[in-house]
Amino acid sequence: MSEPFVLVLTVGLTHKLLPFAPRLQGLARLGWKRPLREVLPAVTCTAQATLLTGKTPHQHGVVANGWLFRETGEVRFWQQSNRLIQAEPIYQTAKRMAAERGGAFTCAKLFWWFNQGAAVDWSVTPKPHYGADGNKVFGIHGSPEGLAGSLESRLGTFPFHTFWGPSAGLPCTSWIARCATEVLREHRPDLTLVYLPHLDYDPQRFGVSGSDMGRLVRELDDACAPLLDQAAQSGARVWVVSEYGHVDVKRVCLPNRALRRAGLLAARPGPFGEVLDTFASRAFAGTHTPASIRRYLRTFLERFFAAQFKRSTLPDGPKVGSVSLSPRGDFRMPSDSQAIAWMEQID
């Protein structure tokens, strides 16, 4: 590939926020911009798998940020293995097609998910060290060997505490952008995938209306500056995409409480509080037949549309029905007081 391509994933960036990002808006003015339909569920792992493969969740198999591994009864989140994607990612497709034509294709994958074992030439990803005594030490993993250490020697230690947890914020995004700048300058991959998570923190902590979105977007735009400059110097095309946007919600959904009150979820008490017991939880049994699933869906749809009909007659009135989709986009599940009645009906 004579012209390198840089794909920057700026989760949370939407059309309405672009005016706060002059550099990124400049890309749109020079090129184009189009709406991107979100996947369901609109979560990181699912969205990234769709962007990498062009497939929907039922095709690539990444249906959430976490999986229940039935063999061990464990729920594991934020898995990094590229083998979890049950469809061919773009870098694998490009390498195969290039080889068929007698050419080569190189790719750098920087902080995108499903990085371990990916068929890429350069990768950097968050990967803590876990000790035999249960200790955890923050760190990053890179391929080829020595890449992560080389980048940290030039850029400083990756600020892992700002990538996950209560201190999550701008420093990690700035570091990743500078990391991508170094990789693009030094190796000039045909495809560089860069994940910049800055807009995924405050809107989830405080809500959109509780966050200074203008400031956050300007910070993201500033963090992109060295990468965009290097892309221009390298003659690379830049595309910017987003996983999903954020909206305010006014109600809370507590499915685990409803499942527990219905006797479908069990927990094990211990010194660190209660821990989910998947083996004792009928919600994880996975023994449903197509006939029973159809019966559950029929009951759900009957109650749902009945509730929606009632709502349509009282558009400005109180919420009616135990399950409904609000015109404002919120999702309402059965209340705690109604959960038992719901389960009795589908039984």
Regions found by a protein language model. Give the residues of each.
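His/Asp/Glu-rich, glycine-adjacent segments
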Residues: 55-207, 283-285, 292-347
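Metal-dependent active-site segment of extracytoplasmic phospho-/sulfohydrolases and closely related
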Residues: 6-7, 23, 218-260, 264, ...
